[in-house]
Every structure is written in C-alpha cells, then in structure tokens.
Regions:
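Acidic, proline/glycine-rich low-complexity intrinsically disordered segments
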Residues: 18, 134, 145, 154, ...
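Tetratricopeptide repeat
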Residues: 215, 247, 251-254, 292, ...
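Tandem amphipathic alpha-helical repeat scaffolds
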Residues: 228-242, 271-288, 311-328, 351-371, ...
Length: 562
C-alpha cells in the first residue's frame, strides 16, 4: 500500500512538473505526504499536482489543513481541484440527520475513540444508530484492539467533519463533553494507580493520550479548574511513561492559567498545591532540581496555609528529594523528618512507607554505608509497611532500595540479584522511567565488578533513554561512567574528554553530583591526571569541554578503534 501510494505520487508529480525527480532529500517528505493522506489515491493525486508550486517538503509542512491545500481553499476552485471536497460532500449528503450530527460531533476526538467515549460526546441514542451508519458507509473505520472496538476517521474526513461542527454552532458543547469524559477517565484511572489494575489503566491512558492532550488544550482555554485537576490526576502516568517534559509543561500551563483566572483562590488552593507537587515530582525525575525545589516550596507553603496534611506530606517528600540533589542536605533531612512526623501522628501508613524509602535513598546518597545502622532501621520498617500495602509498586520500590543498599555496601552480586528482580517487575507494571533507572544501576554494578562489555552495552541504551527523557544530570553521570571504563581500559585521552564533557554539561544544567558520586569522580579524576602529562591533559580537557550534549553522547557511543 505504501509503495503504491509513493509510486502514484511520483507519476502524478512528473505529469505536473516534468523536472520532478525522487531524491534522497525529498523521499522522506513524499513518504510523509502519502502516510498523512491515509493512502487515498485521489488525495495523493491532488497533492502531487501541487509540485508545480511547492517542493514535497513544503507540501508536507502544509498538510495541517489538507482540504485547504488540496482544493485551493475555495469552493469555487477548478473542478479538478474540487473533486476531493465534492466526493466528501456527496458522502455527507447521503447521511441521514442523525448520522450527520454524530459525524460532526466525533470530530473533537484525536487518535480515535471508544463507543463509550462517543456516547459521552454525541449522546447514547444518537450514537447507537448514527455510528453504525457511519461505519457501514465507510465514513468511520473500526478496529479491534484487545477485545474492544476502537473507531477512527481518516484525517481528511475528520477535518471536513470539524468544519461542519464549527458551522453548526455545537463545537463548544461537543468539546465540553469531550473534556468531561476524559477528566472522568483520568479520575477513574488515578484511583487504580496503586492497585493491581494499574497496568491496565495506564495502558488505557496511553491509548487515549492524544484525546487527553486535546481535552487539556480545551480546558486551558475554557475551564482552568478542570485543567488543574487533570494535571494532578495524570502526573503519575506522565512520570511512569517518560512524558516528563510534556507533563511539566502541562502542569506549568495549568497552574499559570488558574492563577491568572478569576477562580476563587480558596476553592482551588488544595488542587493548586497538588499541582505544584506534581510539577516538583516531574521536574525532579527529569533532573531539573532547581525547578523541582521551587515548585515543592510553593506546594509546602500553600499546604501549610490551608492545613492540608496529606498534600503537605507529599510536598515535603518532593522538597526533601530535590534539596538533596541540590546539595542542601540540612533542608533535605528537615523536610523528610517533618513528613515522617506528620505520617506517624496522623496515621498515614502508605505515605510513611514512602518517606522512609526516601530517607533510605537520601541517606545512602549522602552518607553511603557509614550510616548502616540507621539505614537498616529505615529499611526494616519500610519493608514491613510495604508488605501490608495493596499497592504493588510499594514492594517493588523496596526491592529497588535493597538493590541500591547492597550496591552502596559493596555487595554487587546481591545488588544485581535485587535489580534483576525489580527490573522484571517494573517492566510488568509498564513503568518505563523506573526501568531506565534500574538498568543504569545494573550497568553500574557490572562496571564495578569489572564486566566492562556488559556495562557498556547497558550504558549505550540508558544514556540515550536519559537523553530522551531530558535528564541532563543523568546523562552527565553516564558520560562519567563511560570515562571510568575508558580509564580502566587505559584509554586516557578518551576518559579525559568524556569527564570534561560531563563537567561542562553539569555546569550548564546546574546538576551537581551527589556526595557518593563526587567521591568516585574525584578518585577517578585524580588517577587519570596522575598518569598523564599535565599539558596534554589540559588540551584534552578543553576539547571535551567544548562538546555539547549531543556531541558528547555521540563520542561516548563511538567505539574506540585506536
């Protein structure tokens, strides 16, 4: 199908412009045109005719409004140009009134929809009759996905239906219904994030992510309170599915829109505090600790003022985490211990397990194995609480801390055992961020055991995953790990460049090392400099420091053939 579409485009393009040829430069654009026009021969012919005026790249860029591009944007265009619109107009006129109404209202969906969603937007009785008619008349396509029917438009039909919806005056009502449905879906999903049904609900949100984006966009325009609620409900989904930057952007937009609106501040403050906590959590996980700390401070301030203990606990946890990464150790422990005290006084058992796990993590990063007795106490209580929890992730988080604790204590084989088990569980739960994090820990264990090839294979995966996530601090640490291996393999020049590139990235992104990372880095750097001429080292350091992140990653991934 794809090959035939491209062949048709080339034939019609040559008819329109005899100088047209398919090249390596325009081939991706031609393929994109055919894909975005859903392989419809008539649409492809009309697009190819535009090579008289535009390059394939320009045509692809203008496909955002297919009907306007392909018909010249006018109902008085030449008959040949009007063919596509005439075809869709004719199909539309064959529909009865109910089918026409349903066709228009379903244009608010992005990326398809379920029958339940269609009922919410177009009405139960109308959808029952109208949708089946649209399917029978090939205006709507239906697919089976995991035992459920999912419906979609060809994009040209969706744009036509949206035009009709806007003309009808029903667009606002349809979008409001669409928003209400996906706000409700987000609410129902969030209730199951800490249950064994977590993966099924996460997968459902993934399938509806385009619709969620559309609903959020409309909420920002018309209903800022709903936008604020949605970002709170979706924050864990964005975190586990590696939509960290996107999630941060939605949170910032929702908070800004709500704070700039005429909404009653007392009414929205509880949700606003939760939104700041969500922003802090997402920022921390993408390595933007400064933004994370700022958001966490705001959440703490609001939660204290309105006396919302549960939100305060979660905000303090975020403040503790991000402050530890920024080197503000006193604030980190003060925040986490205050959270611990509240949990014990109020009886927040699930949250107590989480703050104890946070204390284990931060204590390890700051004090390493020197605080073994305190770490053991935190771990034992956290493990006992996790075993009584209905949240499947609680046990997995504990397993992860056992792996990290074994790693810091130098028991690398034990660390690997726990990491392997935890990695499998995170994959089962669909938590992609946690998978990347623990693959990194497995790489660290392999490196420290001297299994350099295994470690390098893992680092080659994880450094690109951290880059995609946008966690510049994690990328910098991975570059350092590549450098440590290079030094161990007596590739001093390579090690110097990589360590310098990592240093430059940390400086540019305000991503300091944790105390434990600093100890290893300083030891490696001292050993490297001791075995190298100072003038040569200075030259190599300057070369590495001039690399941007993309260049440094490319250099790290390139095999040393010298």
């Amino acid at each position: 199908m794809e090959y035939e579409s491209v062949r048709l485009f080339i034939e019609r393009a040559i008819q329109a412009n005899s100088q047209f040829t398919l090249t390596s430069e325009n081939a991706p654009s031609v393929a994109q045109i055919c894909e975005r026009l859903d392989g419809i021969p008539l649409a492809i012919e009309l697009a190819a005719a535009r090579v008289k005026l535009f390059t394939p790249q320009q045509i692809a860029e203008r496909l955002g409004d297919r009907l306007k591009l392909l018909t010249g944007g006018s109902r008085t265009a030449l008959p040949r140009q009007q063919t596509l619109r005439a075809l869709i107009d004719w199909s539309y006129l064959t529909l009865n009134e109910t089918e026409q109404s349903v066709l228009c209202r379903l244009a608010v969906f992005s990326g398809g929809w379920t029958f339940e969603a269609a009922e919410a937007v177009a009405g139960e009785m109308e959808v029952m009759d109208g949708l089946s008619g649209l399917v029978n008349k090939s205006m709507v396509h239906v697919e089976e996905q995991e035992g459920q029917s999912r419906y979609r438009y060809l994009e040209t039909i969706r744009q036509y239906a949206m035009e009709k919806l806007l003309e009808s005056g029903d667009a606002i009502d349809a979008r409001d219904r669409h928003l209400a449905h996906f706000l409700d879906l987000s609410r129902r999903a969030e209730r199951h994030f800490r249950t064994p049904q977590r993966l099924a609900w996460m997968n459902q949100l993934e399938a509806e992510h385009d619709n969620i984006r559309a609903a959020l966009s409309w909420a920002l325009e018309s209903d800022p309170e709903s936008a604020l609620r949605m970002v709170v409900l979706l924050s864990l989904f964005w975190q586990s599915h590696n939509y960290l930057t996107e999630g941060c952007n939605w949170c910032q937009s929702a908070i800004s829109r709500a704070e700039g609106s005429s909404l009653d501040r007392d009414k929205i403050d509880p949700t606003r505090a939760q939104a700041y906590t969500a922003l802090a959590m997402l920022s921390v996980n993408r390595g933007d600790h400064q933004s994370g700390q700022t958001a966490a401070r705001k959440s703490v301030a609001i939660a204290r003022r309105i006396d919302d203990k549960l939100t305060l606990v979660r905000a303090l946890n975020s403040l503790g985490f991000t402050s530890a990464f920024l080197g503000d150790i006193t604030l980190a422990f003060d925040s986490l211990h205050e959270s611990e005290d509240i949990c014990r006084k109020v009886g927040y058992r699930e949250e107590l397990a989480e703050v104890l796990q946070a204390l284990v993590y931060v204590t390890m990063e700051v004090h390493g194995s020197q605080a073994a007795e305190q770490l053991q106490a935190y771990m034992q209580e956290s493990l006992a609480l996790s075993q009584r929890s209905v949240d499947p992730e609680a046990a997995v988080r504990t397993e992860g801390l056992l792996a990290r604790l074994a790693f810091f204590q130098g028991d690398l084989a034990e660390a690997r055992k726990h990491a392997d088990l935890m990695l499998d569980r995170h994959r089962e739960m669909g938590d992609q961020l946690a998978v990347t994090d623990h693959q990194s820990m497995m790489a660290h264990s392999a490196r420290q055991l001297g299994n350099f090839e295994e470690a390098l294979a893992l680092y080659r995966e994880t450094i690109q995953e951290w880059q995609e996530i946008g966690h510049r601090g994690a990328v910098a640490h991975q570059l350092e790990c590549f450098a440590f291996i290079a030094r161990a393999k007596e590739e001093g020049e390579r090690a110097a460049k990589l360590m310098s590139a990592a240093e430059a990235l940390r400086e540019a992104s305000s991503s300091p090392r944790t105390p434990q990372e600093r100890i290893e880095y300083d030891t490696e750097l001292d050993s490297l400099r001791a075995g190298m001429d100072e003038k040569a080292f200075t030259s190599l350091w300057a070369e590495g420091h001039s690399m941007n992140m993309e260049q440094a990653i490319e250099y790290a991934l390139t095999e040393n053939t010298s």
